[in-house]
From Swiss-Prot:
It comes from Lodderomyces elongisporus (strain ATCC 11503 / CBS 2605 / JCM 1781 / NBRC 1676 / NRRL YB-4239) (Yeast). Transmembrane segments: none annotated. This is Eukaryotic translation initiation factor 3 subunit I. The keyword Transferase does not apply. GO terms for biological process: formation of cytoplasmic translation initiation complex. The lineage of its organism: Eukaryota, Fungi, Dikarya, Ascomycota, Saccharomycotina. Keywords: Cytoplasm, Initiation factor, Protein biosynthesis, Repeat, WD repeat. GO terms for cellular component: eukaryotic 43S preinitiation complex; eukaryotic 48S preinitiation complex; eukaryotic translation initiation factor 3 complex, eIF3e; eukaryotic translation initiation factor 3 complex, eIF3m; nuclear periphery. Belongs to the eIF-3 subunit I family. SMART domains: WD40 (SM00320).
Length: 350
């Protein structure tokens, strides 16, 4: 599984994202330009330049027509993927931590941080997708969800399958389900901070099941990742690691989840790499056991994304590199003991 190593950012990666077909990979970092790459060979298609500082988040719509970025420069920018033009900029009252298109691409969710006297918000903008008038976007949000009084700010968020719900992760370890049309808080659950004694329990990433978005995985500084059902809002599985986790993803085809993390940069020692803190960790989704690790980064993993067809994954690190991995045959053939027994029994019955 020899990866393609992409060197296009001067600073730490903050998010990597595939488009729906998986032929393009989008990346943002703590520098001020986003990059778009061909995922098959690592060739850079182009850059999106216009932000004045760190870009925290990027997303691409289902048609690969538009791309959105949000950053520390208090801006959310909308770009055309085809030619890299910025067609619209929304101003945010505080740094933008996450942007996410709804499954139909008609809405854009934006998390504004709870700093500088601003109360943390999740805003939803209606996106005009008419190619003749892309520069004509609604300036104000159609919905704003504010952090409750004395509540915990949202750090990450995403959409359920049909865009009915917005699921958010908070810095106190809770996950919340909101009505995407009214903004009403429907359910709240403490997903992190209950599996061990860790004090820092902030939710660092949220990614949904690739097949139907009916469940999602969250990673946290509490050294765990948690699988939660969207409808029942109950915890399904817990994956425990030995370092703070910055990112987690669910793989299609195989029942695996991938976790990435490592010590905070300021706490890193020379032994951290040899201890395997900076490896991508693969867990069995059902049995919750770690089944393997992939080395490569020289610092914590900040973001992972799985190719939509399940043939590989990409990781972005504190070291400024993106590594694009293609799974080999041993990955596709791997069976857990229980699965092997089940398969053998089924073969015996035929």
């Amino acid at each position: 599984m020899r990866p393609i190593k992409l060197m296009g950012h001067e600073r730490s990666l903050t998010q990597v994202k595939y488009n729906r077909e998986g032929d393009l990979l989008f990346s943002v970092a703590k520098d001020n330009a986003a990059s778009i790459w061909y995922s098959s060979n690592g060739e850079r298609l182009g850059t999106l330049e216009g932000h004045q500082g760190v870009i925290w988040s990027i997303d691409v719509d289902p048609e690969t027509l538009l791309c959105a970025t949000g950053g520390g420069d208090l801006a959310v920018k909308l770009w055309t993927v085809e030619n890299g033009q910025c067609v619209y900029t929304w101003n945010s009252p505080s740094p933008v931590r996450r942007v996410s298109f709804s499954p139909d691409g008609k809405k854009l969710l934006v998390i504004a941080d709870q700093v500088m006297g601003h109360i943390g918000t999740i805003s939803v903008y209606d996106i005009n997708r008419d190619t003749a008038s892309l520069t004509n976007q609604a300036e104000t949000a159609s919905l704003v969800i504010e952090t409750e009084q004395n509540g915990s700010k949202a750090t990450v968020a995403g959409w359920s399958e049909d865009g009915r719900f917005i699921i958010a992760g908070h810095d106190n370890g809770y996950v919340s389900k909101y009505d995407a049309h009214t903004g009403e808080l429907l359910k709240s659950l403490q997903a992190h901070g209950i599996h061990n004694e860790e004090k820092n329990v902030s939710v660092t990433d949220i990614q949904f099941a690739p097949e139907d978005r009916s469940y999602f995985i969250t990673s946290s500084k509490d050294k765990c990742a948690v699988l939660t059902d969207v409808d029942t809002f109950e915890i399904l599985k817990v994956y425990k690691a030995d370092a703070p986790m910055n990112t987690a993803a669910i793989t299609p085809l195989k029942d695996f989840v991938i976790l990435g993390g490592g010590q905070e940069a300021r706490n890193v020692t020379t032994t951290a790499e040899s201890q395997g803190k900076f490896e991508a960790r693969f867990y069995h989704k059902i049995f919750e056991e770690e089944i393997g690790r992939v080395k490569g980064h020289f610092g914590p993993l900040n973001t992972v994304a799985v190719h939509p067809d399940g043939t590989g994954y990409s990781s972005g690190g504190e070291d400024g590199f993106i590594r694009v991995h293609t799974f080999d045959k041993s990955y596709k053939d791997f069976l857990f003991d229980a699965e092997r027994t089940e398969k053998a029994a089924a073969a015996g019955l035929d």
